[in-house]
């Protein structure tokens, strides 16, 4: 089982769930037991997985087409949007699907690259709280230049 704080969703989040149900007899009558097999934001299409695969390919050094690079290269405003969202709510570090869904499935690649860039320049870090890993803002030590993030340099140089 998982503790509730390890689930990357908050009260009110709309999710699609795959559940295994079983019915068993007990002295009080038939009982229903359920086990969650998978959770993800409701209504996700294929864009999230497709763009996430481009980001994985980028990290592995696999060449991307110009079109693929354009899909996952964030503008400064995209990175600011991700930073503000991380400021507004505690997001799980190990499952970024809810964050990507909130910021638009079509922006998944840009969101994932923005999170990586923010981590690489030291503006955010993964911290463990209550058995779960979260993305947390790091108090800035001097000025940070997003252009110094290796992931962004890699996208420019491809």
Show the residue positions of the predicted features.
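Acidic, two-metal ion nucleic-acid-processing modules in DNA metabolism proteins
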Residues: 1-158
